[in-house]
């Protein structure tokens, strides 16, 4: 065996032994070893300098051994680098491992908005009384919003409801009454009376302040059937108020005017803060205005093809914001819409 072959064998054995000693923490040591063995001034290059002393017959053989040694050492360095990287990744994963048996961070539970809570409570009251809940369009026709409610185009009461018009005949509804008109059109009175509520968002051209908003929520109710009287309306209103504000509450009806009811009334509830004695909430009167109501105007019935000499009905409407403000002592309607979590969290 020639001297070069012996040197190659010794270099391979020493290098492979050194690679086995290198750990992931000493990766630079492997790079230094690679340069010292395979670099331009490395050990293998020094061995090759002895080729000038090898006979011409032996040079191909020795050259083959040199190439084999270079290939073996190069593969060994690559394999070691791969192993070190795998160990490094494994160590990192181990340090970042998660104990899946540990309890997780609690997820903050959401809750319904106070207006949603109020609406659902009111709807549940009416569902328990046999009413159906009917939804309708927020973008409505002038015909259903006004004319079907006994408000023709030249009616002075239209000035009471400043309206967001999209076109001359299309608008954002100012109340949920159009839902009632469509329901009367579709109802089969041969199967019994119509009892419904129509909750939803409505729009008025009001300037936003503590008690007014350009959008708010209404729940309007309607009952149409045979022999429906003012006494039925009063009894229904009394029951509704007691379920919303407490069994001890009483109501008072005051004459009023609405184009779609005749007679029309404003409904007051006995003050739930002072019990009727008079306080700042009821403005010393002992009563708080809560909703409007009345007997359905015969013209409204007739526009749905209902014989007003046979059928009669009553209607009422109240605002969810109004109910929530009274129940929870809220003094600014804007709080419902500003998205302040501090406000919402009070009503979990």
UniProtKB/Swiss-Prot annotation:
EC class name: ligase
SUPFAM superfamilies found in the cross-reference section: Class II aaRS and biotin synthetases (SSF55681), tRNA-binding arm (SSF46589)
Known catalytic reactions: tRNA(Phe) + L-phenylalanine + ATP = L-phenylalanyl-tRNA(Phe) + AMP + diphosphate + H(+)
Cellular localisation: Cytoplasm
CDD domains: PheRS_alpha_core (cd00496)
Cellular component annotations (GO), alphabetically ordered: cytoplasm
Keywords: Aminoacyl-tRNA synthetase, ATP-binding, Cytoplasm, Ligase, Magnesium, Metal-binding, Nucleotide-binding, Protein biosynthesis
Assembly and interaction partners: Tetramer of two alpha and two beta subunits.
Family assignment from sequence similarity: Belongs to the class-II aminoacyl-tRNA synthetase family. Phe-tRNA synthetase alpha subunit type 1 subfamily.
Protein name: Phenylalanine--tRNA ligase alpha subunit
Species classification: Bacteria, Bacillati, Bacillota, Bacilli, Lactobacillales
């Amino acid at each position: 065996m020639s001297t070069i072959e012996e040197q190659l064998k010794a270099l391979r054995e020493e290098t492979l032994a050194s690679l086995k000693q290198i750990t992931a923490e000493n990766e630079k040591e492997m790079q230094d070893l690679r340069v010292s063995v395979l670099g331009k001034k490395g050990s293998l290059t020094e061995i090759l300098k002895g080729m000038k002393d090898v006979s011409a017959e032996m040079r191909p053989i020795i050259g083959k051994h040199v190439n084999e040694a270079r290939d073996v050492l190069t593969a060994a360095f690559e394999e070691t680098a791969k192993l070190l990287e795998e160990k490094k990744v494994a160590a990192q994963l181990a340090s970042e491992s998660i104990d899946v048996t540990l309890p997780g961070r609690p997820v903050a539970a959401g809750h319904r908005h106070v207006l949603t809570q109020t609406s659902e409570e009111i709807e549940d009251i009416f569902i328990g009384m046999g009413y159906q809940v009917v939804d309708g369009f927020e973008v409505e026709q002038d015909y259903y919003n006004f004319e079907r409610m006994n408000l023709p185009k030249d009616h002075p009461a239209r000035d009471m409801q400043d309206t967001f018009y999209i076109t001359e005949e299309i608008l954002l509804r100012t109340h949920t009454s159009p839902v009632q008109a469509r329901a009367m059109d579709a109802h089969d009175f041969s199967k019994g009376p119509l009892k419904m509520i129509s909750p939803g968002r409505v729009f008025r051209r009001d300037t936003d302040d503590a008690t007014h908003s350009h959008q708010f929520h209404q729940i309007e109710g309607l009952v149409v059937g045979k022999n429906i009287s003012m006494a039925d309306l009063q009894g229904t209103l009394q029951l509704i108020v007691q379920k919303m504000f407490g069994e001890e509450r009483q109501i008072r009806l005051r004459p009023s005017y609405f184009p779609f009811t005749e007679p029309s009334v404003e409904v007051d509830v006995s003050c739930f803060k002072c019990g009727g004695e008079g306080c700042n909430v009821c403005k010393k009167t002992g009563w708080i205005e809560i909703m409007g109501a009345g007997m359905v105007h015969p013209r409204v019935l007739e526009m749905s093809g209902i014989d007003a000499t046979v059928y009669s009905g009553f209607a009422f409407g109240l605002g969810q914001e109004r109910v929530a403000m009274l129940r929870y002592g809220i003094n600014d309607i804007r709080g419902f819409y500003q998205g302040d979590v501090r406000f919402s969290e009070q009503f979990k």
